[in-house]
Amino acid sequence: MESPVALLLLLLLCLGALAPTPGSASSEAPPLVNEDVKRTVDLSSHLAKVTAEVVLVHPGGGSTSRASSFVLALEPELESRLAHLGVQIKGEDEEDNNLEVRETKIKGKSGRFFTVKLPVALDPGSKISVVVETVYTHVLHPYPTQITQSEKQFVVFEGNHYFYSPYPTKTQTMRVKLASRNVESYTKLGNPSRSEDVLDYGPFKDIPAYSQDTFKVHYENNSPFLTITSMTRVIEVSHWGNIAVEENVDLKHTGAVLKGPFSRYDYQRQPDSGISSIRSFKTILPAAAQDVYYRDEIGNVSTSHLLILDDSVEMEIRPRFPLFGGWKTHYIVGYNLPSYEYLYNLGDQYALKMRFVDHVFDEQVIDSLTVKIILPEGAKNIQVDSPYDISRAPDELHYTYLDTFGRPVIVAYKKNLVEQHIQDIVVHYTFNKVLMLQEPLLVVAAFYILFFTVIIYVRLDFSITKDPAAEARMKVACITEQVLTLVNKRLGLYRHFDETVNRYKQSRDISTLNSGKKSLETEHKAVTSEIAVLQSRLKTEGSDLCDRVSEMQKLDAQVKELVLKSAVEAERLVAGKLKKDTYLENEKLSSGKRQELVTKIDHILDAL
């Protein structure tokens, strides 16, 4: 008798054999029918946007099984250029009503196939309406491939008249929206009608599964064929309140290549000259963006304009030259964001919610995108949640100021992106808040070591032998510097007393004059005493400068005598004991003698 464990293993193996293989369409899935399909092909820009409103019916046909999913197919000619595929239930207005889509395979059939999971299984005889949105890049080909500056741009698009599907279609219509009314040619299947820039095909009846019939249109399209060939988006997160974003962008005009020379004169004079070229475009930045900069290889580009709106910041980017077909340019845009709008935490758990790619220009196409998210030093247990598939490279380390073991860098790649990819990714990580003190402590430690080193250095004697003469010269120089300072201070006392005398002559207030005299005597005595002390120190050091200081002291005594004499003369003038003419003559003589003495003192100071 077999053990219960063996029986359980056998049962699990049987169930695994009966289950459908992941990534392949189940052969047991009930057949469905496209009861009605309304296709809209928007070719008004450089993208091909195809929207199909499909009414799916579960015909039953003796089958009682319910359909929990259905299969979408893409033509082999367009599958490699698919940028976005989205499926929604028609009529539902919820923001997140996209159905789950997974790529699958069907044996014996070319093209790409996707399994779409229905929110509610479809019973036999019931129906459901879905909206399928697809966006294709680089499927509008310029024809001719080269044009002159004055010519208009024409493009060719090739697709399928029919809704390519693994299910039969009962009725189908197709509406094609073009960029202009100027149409060179288009296929005439089913006698389509044309109105201005719109072509209407159908209705087509009873279309078998996997039906293909080439649809081709050749028309004028002067919309900007602007492509981001390569873009690197760097997001640097700081727990000190800031998130820095920088985008390195390589742009190329992928329309018809310019043939012949470029005339800026004609370009400025004629409005329709270079009609398919690109003068400028607008980039929408987050509303909280600040410290915005825009530069290229040369430097800052001053032709850009910034407009702050309620819900965004609009930046007009104008390259240094207009972009014609085949022309390229490179630029860098950067800005700062407050972290409280994008960074959330609960204890040591952090979550960064930011856009994987942001708006660069309307109808944008990005061939290759690299996103680098620089987290704070010490971030661990990093997990990334993305709304769509992205490729991850091994994490890197980034070193900047005060880093010790490096900041972790998440590196992610994706190709062929459009506006529908402007969605948020969430980065989860853990971070010990104690590490926020690391950088301030490093700064404190660095200054402490610097000051301690300087203190030790100035106290060390690195000379091999001592030089008494050099030390004596240094002492004399130090004393001389102090003497110069004191002499200048003493001369300043005289100037201040002169101002006091002038005020006395105007106000006739004798108390002002007496107070000035007393202040002069007190401060002059103190300064002169200090100079005498320094003079004795010079004599002790054996310097001949001692005699010059002594001579300067004698000259200063004469200057002081003249200053006090001038005050006495002013006193007599105010008292009416001296005529004004006599006073002015005496004052002139006194000033001349005083100036001569001060000049001699200055010469001695220069000699010191």
From Swiss-Prot:
Any one GO biological process: protein N-linked glycosylation
Residues annotated as glycosylated: 300
Pathway membership: Protein modification; protein glycosylation
Entry membrane topology: Single-pass type I membrane protein
Lumenal side: 26-440
Entry's Gene Ontology cellular component terms: cytosol; endoplasmic reticulum membrane; oligosaccharyltransferase complex; oligosaccharyltransferase complex A; oligosaccharyltransferase complex B; rough endoplasmic reticulum
Residue(s) of cross-link: Glycyl lysine isopeptide (Lys-Gly) (interchain with G-Cter in SUMO2): 539
Leader sequence segment: 1-25
Family listed: Belongs to the OST1 family.
Record's protein name: Dolichyl-diphosphooligosaccharide--protein glycosyltransferase subunit 1
Organism, as annotated: Mus musculus (Mouse)
Lineage: Eukaryota, Metazoa, Chordata, Craniata, Vertebrata
